[in-house]
Amino acid sequence: MRLTAKQVTWLKVSLHLAGLLPFLWLVWAINHGGLGADPVKDIQHFTGRTALKFLLATLLITPLARYVKQPLLIRTRRLLGLWCFAWATLHLTSYALLELGVNNLALLGKELITRPYLTLGIISWVILLALAFTSTQAMQRKLGKHWQQLHNFVYLVAILAPIHYLWSVKIISPQPLIYAGLAVLLLALRYKKLRSLFNRLRKQVHNKLSV
């Protein structure tokens, strides 16, 4: 049985709740001592993990829609991507304001350059910013064929973000490895597409170098 447009609308409402409820929990935890001994790190890790969850969910939609033969599921992909960006922005903000502090924001640029795992994180965020800004149908029409080329960069985020997470933790635990493994699996499902993109990029680079 195929999903109807009305059912997809209710699914979107549920996904909005899934994006909002973790924020409400975080606010409650901050105000009621629900965090650990290092609340700043807990906030950073929580926001980062939630962004990763929405990134993985975004990548899951296309293969899932094909597997269960529910093409209307694709309509939820943009919503999930926007929640990924929202949580990634909270993650970056928590680092800038809580780790560095308002008085030390001038150090942010230096930190992002001198710490490789932060460099990967900010690259991922900038890509997500571009994808969020161009996610509307109007931007899709305006960019034409370049829209899909731009949004293929989500696969780069799927590589960089788990590495950023693994690199940022002092002690490797199962959790970041699980996120990395899921990202690899979701990318592996797109092996043919990624191979085609890589070959096309390699050809373009070769042609430019040959000029």
From Swiss-Prot:
Necessary cofactors: FMN; heme b
Keyword presence, Flavoprotein: yes
GO cellular component, one term: plasma membrane
Entry-linked InterPro entries: Fe3_Rdtase_TM_dom, MsrQ-like
Membrane topology: Multi-pass membrane protein
Subcellular location: Cell inner membrane
Cofactor binding mode and count: Binds 1 FMN per subunit.
One Gene Ontology molecular-function label: heme binding
Transmembrane segments: 17-37, 54-74, 82-102, 116-136, 153-173
Subunit (UniProt): Heterodimer of a catalytic subunit (MsrP) and a heme-binding subunit (MsrQ).
Family listed: Belongs to the MsrQ family.
Protein name as annotated: Protein-methionine-sulfoxide reductase heme-binding subunit MsrQ
Protein's organism: Escherichia coli (strain SMS-3-5 / SECEC)
Lineage: Bacteria, Pseudomonadati, Pseudomonadota, Gammaproteobacteria, Enterobacterales
Designated gene of the protein: msrQ
